[in-house]
Design a protein with these regions (language model features):
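Phosphate/nucleotide-binding beta-alpha loop and adjacent structural elements of enzyme active sites
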Residues: 1-228
Length: 228
């Protein structure tokens, strides 16, 4: 089924909900609480957290780790990754998710705006403008570095993951590109929380055409469930 952009904007707006973050949960808008409930308070599940930051601040996966889930956190920013390594017990990887297992050019932001870092190839002009505006206002610097890239298939194969209960994607503008690298027919994923601050209809179109439906919008994230 083909949806117009105007319909998608209307539909996404209807799906917006607000949750209070409860003690013991770490997500910025309560995504972890919501996903845990949607998956039936599942025990011994697994997660893949792409753009995991320092592993604690606004983490969508730390709650699940503390519940005994297994998983992997992926964070490309070299400085932030050092904090991730110290703070998390799960598997961690300093890399970018891409369509290649070769090195890619990474736009690494230092300072208060470090969470805006990302793969240069996938950033649009609005994101570049935001980075330089925030550096101008808050200080910091940005450098281009080469960093290891890995495909989702290689990532999961290397860590013996055959299916994913919860996929979190928060990569500051690269979310759609990363989702397109996943072959959801080969890699079953039950639930996805993906940042979409601009409410671009492209993510909705891609995921609904790959067997998911939008459950709700919460903060800047959209939460999708697999159709079974």
């Amino acid at each position: 089924m083909i949806f117009s952009n105007s319909f998608i904007y209307w539909y996404i707006k209807r799906k917006f909900r607000k949750l209070n973050v409860r003690p013991g949960m770490y997500s910025q808008y309560g995504q972890d609480k919501l996903v845990f409930e949607l998956l039936g308070n599942k025990q011994c599940g697994n997660f893949v957290d792409i753009g995991a930051n320092d592993g604690v601040t606004f983490s969508n996966s730390l709650f699940f780790e503390e519940k005994g889930w297994s998983g992997i956190c992926v964070e490309p920013h070299s400085t932030i990754f050092k904090n991730l390594e110290k703070r998390r017990k799960c598997k961690v990887l300093n890399a970018c998710i891409s369509d290649t297992n070769k090195d890619v050019t990474f736009y690494e932001v230092e300072g208060a705006s470090h969470m805006l870092s990302g793969i240069k190839e996938f950033m649009d002009e609005r994101h570049f403008t935001r980075i330089h505006r925030e550096i101008s206002e808050n200080g910091g610097a940005v450098t281009e570095v080469k960093i290891q890239a890995i495909t989702p298939q290689s990532l999961l194969l290397n860590h013996n993951i055959s299916k994913v209960d919860f996929l979190s994607v928060d990569t500051e503008g690269c979310e759609l590109s990363i989702l397109k690298f996943f072959n959801f027919n080969e890699i079953p994923v039950a639930c996805i929380s993906v940042e979409n601050g601009s409410r671009s209809p492209a993510i909705f179109k891609h995921l609904t055409s790959n067997g998911f439906h939008l459950y709700c919008c919460i903060g800047c994230d959209e939460v999708y469930l697999r159709d079974y």
